[in-house]
Amino acid sequence: MSDNQSWNSSGSEEDLETESGPPVERCGVLSKWTNYIHGWQDRWVVLKNNTLSYYKSEDETEYGCRGSICLSKAVITPHEFDECRFDISVNDSVWYLRAQDPDHRQRWIDSIEQHKSESGYGSESSLRRHGSMVSLVSGASGYSATSTSSFKKGHSLREKLAEMETFRDILCRQVDTLQKYFDACADAVSKDELERDKVEDDEDDFLHSHPNGDYIHSSIGSKDKLFQHVSPKGINGIDFKGEAITFKATTAGILATLSHCIDLMVKREDSWQKRLDKEIEKRRRVEEAYKNAMTELKKKSHFGGPDYEEGPNSLINEEEFFDAVEAALDRQDKIEQSQSEKGRSHWPSSLPSTEAYTTAGSHRFVQAPPSCPPPTDLVSSSDEHRFRIQVEEMVQNHMTYSLQDVGGDANWQLVVEEGEMKVYRREVEENGIVLDPLKATHSVKGVTGHEVCQHFWNVDVRNDWETTIENFHVVEKLSPNAIIVYQTHKRVWPASQRDVLYLSAIRMVPAASENEMDTWIVCNFSVDHDNAPLNRCVRAKINIAMICQTLVSPPEGNKEISRDNIQCKITYVANVNPGGWAPASVLRAVAKREYPKFLKRFTSYVQEKTAGKSILF
């Protein structure tokens, strides 16, 4: 048995298996999903000491990292569709990363997996660091045997292996000794045969006389001389019987020690099997709990994740989409309510005392008082600009069709009715996109149609009542009563952010007869403009009209007309193509919720702004 096969376990257990070198550090530029506003941004990423950190750029590493995660329990997931993207998740924290190309992504994944495998959680290196021998005998406490060696926890098997090493040395020496003995015996036998042949050939030449005259052979003495060295103690002083007894005892000791080692290993195996069974059961329960947790987590969705927002490959279903939108709208409503309560204290409630109320005679429908300039002076019907024909067509269409009563039309559904306000909807879809026309009718006391339309059209007061706009600006002023406006709406996650580019025109349509009402109308419809190209937002298309008619109830006697005597009949029509990939059920539910809120909020704002002021007919 060669020495290089020694079972000596006195050295470190880590030497039983060659450990690989430390994992290679890595750094470079990766695109990281920051948030739903800025999207993917290049970041300097560093992989070092089982930690993944990122910086805004390579030049800003000295200012400290923007974030880091430990890879010990990280889960690395290559994206199913994007060949350059991979996600790293630790508990509920997720990093979304994109490489330059698939090969670049694979190199990063391999490096991260290498660091993770060396982290000490279930890796081969962690098993080596714990030590194979100690692990095998860690449960041997209390083992009872007839051997005189120590059977304390962590030492029994090691000491038995040391005993077997000693037995091996003894056995090797005994084998060498016995081999020498057998070799000597073989040599002696060979020499004996030669001597016997020689004696038989020459025995006649060596006769001796006996006193009685007989001749005898002298070979007895020579034979004694020949075989004197083959006695048990005659070859190199070796005690064959003693060596045989010792050899038998040594082999018996080896067998006993080996049997004891096997018993220890069997006991360890039983112990580890029980622990394995417990771990398997524990793992089963943990996996079941993990699946349940993941199911619950998916219901809540990862806020801001690129896979959990509106898009063709969105992982969020319609129910979860609606829940998320509704929750975001509720939060926004609370913020708007608190802001509106603060803003109301700053709204002027009355005009200076030098201004007087406008008066008019008793009539059923409003006519401008003589002291007021004619409406055509305020809003001309003969604007000259490049969209003039489109504006005229829109106004005529709305005056023809939008004022028609749809209450008895089976194609229109009454979706909301609150007091004087009624909201109708006609379901229309085109290529999977919801294009439902909505029509609302409302009656508001204390305001005129001119006042309502003026506040709806005037961009100077837009932010006072419009709470869904993030920012807007006038792209071009076509005429005193026609402008092109670009506005970006606040994003409601997980829906994509949307913008609108539209022409807004205000117009008064005089009454055709004395018994009819003058009508004020604001038309907003989508147009294109070079100064507002498409961007990261989803461009929505709109065709909206606010149509208002003023009714006046005659005051008693010769009293002046007050706001108690006026009432505004409002017809609001909206045709919106939202674009994008939002589910139809979500769009309809949001429209049903938001349109009535908008009308109530806007009309209340006009009432508060005009209260105590002169009437604008």
Swiss-Prot record:
Assigned GO CC terms: endoplasmic reticulum; Golgi apparatus
This protein's record includes keyword Secreted: no
Organism domain of life: Eukaryota
Domain-level remarks: The START domain recognizes ceramide and mediates the intermembrane transfer of ceramide. The PH domain targets the Golgi apparatus.
Location, primary (coarse class): cytoplasm
Listed Polar residues bias regions: 1-11
Entry function: May mediate the intracellular trafficking of ceramide in a non-vesicular manner.
SUPFAM superfamilies the record matches: Bet v1-like, PH domain-like
Annotated spans, Disordered: 1-23, 332-355
SMART domains membership: PH, START
UniProt motif FFAT: location: 320-326
Residue ranges constituting the PH domain according to the UniProt record: 23-117
Gene3D superfamilies to which the protein is assigned, alphabetical: 3.30.530.20, Pleckstrin-homology domain (PH domain)/Phosphotyrosine-binding domain (PTB) (2.30.29.30)
Source taxonomy: Eukaryota, Metazoa, Chordata, Craniata, Vertebrata
GO terms, biological process: lipid transport
Coiled-coil annotated residue ranges, if any: 268-302
Keywords: Coiled coil, Cytoplasm, Endoplasmic reticulum, Golgi apparatus, Lipid transport, Transport
Boundaries of every START domain copy: 383-611
MF (Gene Ontology): lipid binding
Reaction equation(s) it catalyzes: N-hexadecanoylsphing-4-enine(in) = N-hexadecanoylsphing-4-enine(out)
Name assigned to this protein: Ceramide transfer protein
